[in-house]
C-alpha cells in the first residue's frame, strides 16, 4: 500500500536541504507518494536574516549544520546572499511548477541554487532561469510571478501550515501518522515508512 508523506520546508532553511537529501535516499524504490508543502520561516515583512554579518549564525553553521551535512554526505555551502531573501516568490513559482508536474524538480533546483551555488532565489530573473532549467516555459513562469498569479494559493498554503497542520518548525516530515521534526538520518525515515506499511 502507498504511504502518503507530507514534507514541510523552506528554501532558505539549511536543515531542510540536508534533511531532504537523507529523506530522498530513504524513499528510493519504495511505494510512497510525497507532497511538498510550503512553509515560510520569515514571511514578509518579518526582518530578514543576515547570517553573513551575524557571527552567531556563522558559528551555528560551523558547529551544527556543516557537521550534520558531512555526516549525511550532503554538499552544502554557507550562502553569501545577504540578507537571505524572502521565499514567497520562489514558492509561487513552485505552485506554477506543480501545475506542470515539475514541482519536485523545481523544488530540488531552487534548494541547490541557494545552498550550493549562492544564487539569490528572491530574484524573479534567477527563478525564471531555474524554472527553464527544469523544463518549464520561462515566459509563462516569469509572467505568473510578476502578476502574482499564485499569491493567494501561497497564502492559503501558509495558512494551512501555520494554523491547520500546526507546523512550528521545518523541516517537518509527516509519514502516514508519524511526525518527524527536523533533519533525520535515512534509517529514521526508512523505519517510519516500514512501520506505516505494516499498519495497512
UniProtKB/Swiss-Prot annotation:
CDD domains named in the record: DsbA_FrnE (cd03024)
GO-annotated molecular function: oxidoreductase activity
Name used for this protein in its record: Uncharacterized protein YwbO
UniProt organism field: Bacillus subtilis (strain 168)
Pfam families: DSBA (PF01323)
Gene it is expressed from: ywbO
SUPFAM superfamilies named among the record's database cross-references: Thioredoxin-like
Signal peptide interval: none
Domain of life: Bacteria
Amino acid at each position: 500500500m502507498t504511504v502518503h508523506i507530507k514534507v514541510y520546508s523552506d528554501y532558505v532553511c539549511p536543515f531542510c536541504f540536508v534533511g531532504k537529501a537523507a529523506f530522498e535516499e530513504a524513499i528510493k524504490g519504495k511505494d510512497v507518494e510525497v507532497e511538498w508543502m510550503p512553509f515560510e520561516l520569515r514571511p514578509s515583512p518579518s526582518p530578514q536574516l543576515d547570517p553573513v554579518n551575524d557571527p552567531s549564525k556563522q558559528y551555528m553553521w560551523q558547529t551544527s549544520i556543516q557537521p550534520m551535512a558531512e555526516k549525511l554526505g550532503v554538499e552544502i555551502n554557507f550562502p553569501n546572499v545577504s540578507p537571505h531573501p524572502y521565499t514567497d516568490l520562489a514558492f509561487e513559482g513552485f505552485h506554477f511548477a506543480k501545475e506542470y508536474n515539475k514541482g519536485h524538480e523545481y523544488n530540488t533546483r531552487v534548494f541547490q541554487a541557494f545552498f550550493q551555488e549562492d544564487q539569490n532565489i528572491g530574484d524573479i530573473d534567477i527563478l525564471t532561469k531555474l524554472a527553464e532549467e527544469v523544463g518549464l516555459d520561462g515566459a509563462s513562469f516569469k509572467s505568473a510571478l510578476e502578476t502574482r498569479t499564485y499569491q493567494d494559493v501561497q497564502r492559503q498554503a501558509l495558512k494551512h501550515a501555520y494554523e491547520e497542520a500546526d507546523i512550528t518548525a521545518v523541516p517537518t516530515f509527516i509519514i502516514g501518522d508519524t511526525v518527524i521534526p527536523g533533519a533525520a538520518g535515512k534509517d529514521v525515515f526508512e523505519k517510519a515508512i516500514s512501520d506505516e506499511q505494516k499498519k495497512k
